[in-house]
Amino acid sequence: MIKTTTFTKRLLIGVLSTAPFFAHSAENIELPATLAMTAYGTGSAGYTQMVSIGNLLQNEYGTSVRILPGENDVSRMTPLRMGRVPLCACGIASYYGFEGVLLFADPQWGPQSIRLISTSTATFGMGVAVAGDINVKTPADLKGKRVAYIRGDDANNIGTEAFLAFGGLTWDDVERVEFPGYGRSFEGIVANQADAAFTMSVAPTAQQVAASPRGIVWPELDPANKEGWQRLQAIAPYFQPHNVTAAAGKNYGKDSPWVGATYPYPILVGNESLDDKTARNLVRVLIEDHDKYKDAAPGNTGYSLENQNMQWVIPYHDAVVEYYKEIGHWTDAMQVHQDGLVKRQNLLKTTWESFMGANPPEDRDAFRSGWMEARANALEAEGMKPVFR
């Protein structure tokens, strides 16, 4: 499952020879007069990027973009589920929605019929930031160390668990220190109450640790360590190896990258029912007009064609696939991968419908257990990995 930026760039050498050179604005763009979407809260990188893309759409094509900021996964995903907005600039919760797990293992949710439009994979990474004074070089060195666990933050804790797995560790091999929130976990590192916590490599919280007397280090994830990556991706398959050139700490930069990991942020998704014209024209603008907005907000470089992971964990919208075929950026292997994801999505939806139609338990915990068991059984019967149980 390992996918790297290097692979994508090698692939491009072959496919871009037949693809058009995008030197001018995308032509014959047809988008709605108003396009609404949800995003992370104001001040977040995702919100700032959507504002810059909205400015491009307004100035070049007369489309007004209305952004609804949401402070948590529920507030970002609910308008998409209810059909109040056609798009969400989401985080990794979009993948959990696709799978119907965690907060989506709920009677009000279930597997979501979402499709990928585009993602941003820029110079930052995602991983476990570690205090620089405890001699940690790889995830295996975290054994016996104090690792932050955030109450109510599934995405964060799964990321931490995946990094521990890379080093052959579990929560039982470390001292789990619980915190009530993400920010408090990093205050805990500075105050010497914890040694490690999960975050984005350029986040203010990571900068806070880097500026403290303890300093900061990012444990190396050697891409040649196939077994380590298999363990990590068995827990969190959305991670991919990445040479991170933007990371907190004086020892990291363009010439001395953190050999680590990342996953896209934000993740621009729509429902499967999003009309083809909107999906197609939006991805055309994002790809063909990239030079016009790539410097307008931090992270916008990540929307370039070469930064798209064409074999990720959420299926592309059908109209996006057709666009990539037309420009020569689609292979047989990509189609096989896409077909597999669509098959998984359809199986999850039919399994959910059967489960909901069989008088499921009213108790939330019993409901979740029953659904997760039915889900795992259905996936395994088709030779697919449940990932979550």
Where are these regions (language model features)?
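Ligand-binding clefts/hinges and TM-proximal coupling segments of bilobed small-molecule sensing domains
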Residues: G144-A162, Y238-Y303, Q308-V313
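Short, glycine-/small- and polar/acidic-enriched structural segments
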Residues: E27-G152, N156-F166, V177, W218
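Bacterial N-terminal signal peptides that target proteins for export
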Residues: I2-L12
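Sec/Tat signal peptide C-region and signal peptidase I cleavage site
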Residues: F21-S25
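Bacterial N-terminal signal peptides
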Residues: R10-P20
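Pocket-lining segment of extracytoplasmic ligand-binding domains
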Residues: I92-S94, V101-Q108, I134, W171-D173, ...
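Sec-exported extracytoplasmic/periplasmic mature domains
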Residues: N55-G62, R81-V85, A165-L169, V190-A194, ...
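An extracytoplasmic/periplasmic, membrane-proximal ligand-sensing/linker region
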Residues: P32, S201-R214, W218, K277-A279, ...
